[in-house]
């Protein structure tokens, strides 16, 4: 798993991919994601950075009180891909990378509750708004 050293984000687009994995395949999931899937996708032109995350309990102050926030059915694992453009996601290099290695045959079939969300940044790293 990456340590967040790629932050802060300087990309105009973020792809957030989230999923759960069958417990019996969790070790393989993490091994393949870290050693194969991310390295393959980092080589794709237009991929500026990748960080993996695992959901944790969220306790925060909001509305004058401390609350435990619960997001029903939120997947346990997420990967955030920093992209130059949404066109990266349909490039031949991306198409090849997402089907490389053990991911499509040994890991993907054991994932569920998958979500893919594309976000466009509304501010520059300095905090100024973009158009």
Language-model features: locations:
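Macromolecular interaction modules
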Residues: 1-131
């Amino acid at each position: 798993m990456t340590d967040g050293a790629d932050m802060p984000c300087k990309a105009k687009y973020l792809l957030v991919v989230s999923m759960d994995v069958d417990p019996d395949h969790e070790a393989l999931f993490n091994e393949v994601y870290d050693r194969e899937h991310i390295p393959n996708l980092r080589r794709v032109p237009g991929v500026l950075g990748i960080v993996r995350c695992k959901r944790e309990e969220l306790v925060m102050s909001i509305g004058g009180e401390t609350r435990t926030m619960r997001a029903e059915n939120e997947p346990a694992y997420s990967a955030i891909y920093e992209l130059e453009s949404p066109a990266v996601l349909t490039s031949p290099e991306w198409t090849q990378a997402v089907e490389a290695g053990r991911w499509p045959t040994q890991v993907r079939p054991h994932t569920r509750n998958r979500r893919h969300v594309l976000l466009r940044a509304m501010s520059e790293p300095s905090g100024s708004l973009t158009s």
